[in-house]
Amino acid sequence: MSSNPAATLSDVQPDGFFTRGLADADPAVFGGLTEEIAREKKQIELIASENIVSKAVLEAQGSVFTNKYAEGYPGKRYYQGCHPSDVVEQLAIDRAKQLFNCGFANVQPHSGAQANGAVMLALTQPGDTIMGLSLDAGGHLTHGAKAALSGKWYKAVQYGVRPDDHRIDFDQVEALAREHKPKLIITGGSAYPRHIDFARFRAIADEVGALFMVDMAHFAGLVAGGVHPTPFGHAHVVTTTTHKTLRGPRGGMIMTDDEAIAKKINSAVFPGLQGGPLMHVVAAKAVAFGEALRPEFKAYAAAVVENAKVLAARLKERGADLVSGGTDTHLALVDLRPIGVTGRDADEALERAGITCNKNGVPNDPLPPVKTSGIRVGSPAGTTRGFGPAEFREIADMIADVLDGLAKNGPEGNGQTEAHVKARVEALCDRFPIYPEL
């Protein structure tokens, strides 16, 4: 036996473990959090994949559900003490099914990439052929890009957009599908600003015996709000993130109307790809889905699209070259090649001016992903903040001012313009405050 005296509570538990806030317990992390809150309050967020969640979503995600392991599914867990977890996960499932009018929903994927990976695990085998929209045409890494798992484990065939109007080239899709006979055809993307003809994709999939998957991560909130065509009724399976336009926590989800596919999906998510779900995130998903079922969310979704169109139209009036000429959704893509500016220089200059967007490839982009020839801008976060068409028109002018100055003076000589725009940005943000208690 050990001769050491028994450990006291103070030996194993820091003072104030259950009572001290972050500022006292870890000032370094609290400093980073404080900086992020200040950034969100004072900058205009135009990254199309980002949004601003409600206080209720923040509260759920920061809840005691972070303590709980809940491997399995509601009513069929591998641990005890899971009744509260069953309640919130079933709420998330039921609300997702109601929101998208679908038969089955798995709310456990940790991310959109995990959701896409689970579908591939469920419905394909390594070495199978899959088809997806190429990255430079607006697709996503997980749809078969060479650098991603989907491009390494599968024979990935990539389709693109027409060079004249930058819309999906369905003649190419048909030809590639007939030639390669893919097991899975994927559509959706991260920088495609137009509606997609889901019915035509399904017809092509049926012709070649493929399954059809829609990744609606970017436009799920627009579908939920009734301002974007729904993929349900066409796709065999639908994946999404739960943030972006859906305005929930960062996470993923998989939906289908096919019971046999649903069973395969459930097994692929757990135990195939993940262990226990992140129950604090699942709880936050349930909250966000509940918010999206309210009438105000339909108005929000409509405003997101209207604001994006205003932003794109004003940028075009100011001389910007827009990929596809505009947008049907929440995002627009600006080709900077006509003004001789790179995406990296543009997004860095805009951030110095208080506007966050991201550098982005454009169709047939000659520059690498770390540099790019374009930027992507979006309206979800600004719309959540309360910006309307007048504000987005003003934002477009601020963007154009920075880009014009950059083209004329270069990154080193654009400081005066950036400082002037930053003052305008902060004045606009002060009129539309967020998180007053933080």
Swiss-Prot record:
Tagged with keyword Hydrolase: no
Catalytic activity: (6R)-5,10-methylene-5,6,7,8-tetrahydrofolate + glycine + H2O = (6S)-5,6,7,8-tetrahydrofolate + L-serine
Cell compartments where the protein resides: Cytoplasm
Top-level EC class: transferase
Coiled coil: none
Pfam family name, one: SHMT
GO process terms (BP): glycine biosynthetic process from serine; tetrahydrofolate interconversion
Disordered: region residues: 361-383
A GO term from the CC aspect: cytosol
Keyword line: Amino-acid biosynthesis, Cytoplasm, One-carbon metabolism, Pyridoxal phosphate, Transferase
GO MF, one annotated term: pyridoxal phosphate binding
Pathway assignment: One-carbon metabolism; tetrahydrofolate interconversion; Amino-acid biosynthesis; glycine biosynthesis; glycine from L-serine: step 1/1
Binding site for (6S)-5,6,7,8-tetrahydrofolate: L135, G139, H140, L141
InterPro entries from the UniProt entry: PyrdxlP-dep_Trfase, PyrdxlP-dep_Trfase_major, PyrdxlP-dep_Trfase_small, Ser_HO-MeTrfase, Ser_HO-MeTrfase-like, Ser_HO-MeTrfase_PLP_BS, SHMT-like_dom
Site entry: Plays an important role in substrate specificity: H243
Enzyme Commission number: 2.1.2.1
Cofactor(s) it depends on: pyridoxal 5'-phosphate
Keyword ATP-binding: no
N6-(pyridoxal phosphate)lysine: modified positions: K244
Job of this protein: Catalyzes the reversible interconversion of serine and glycine with tetrahydrofolate (THF) serving as the one-carbon carrier. This reaction serves as the major source of one-carbon groups required for the biosynthesis of purines, thymidylate, methionine, and other important biomolecules. Also exhibits THF-independent aldolase activity toward beta-hydroxyamino acids, producing glycine and aldehydes, via a retro-aldol mechanism.
Family assignment from sequence similarity: Belongs to the SHMT family.
Assembly mode: Homodimer.
Protein name per UniProt: Serine hydroxymethyltransferase
Species annotation: Rhizorhabdus wittichii (strain DSM 6014 / CCUG 31198 / JCM 15750 / NBRC 105917 / EY 4224 / RW1)
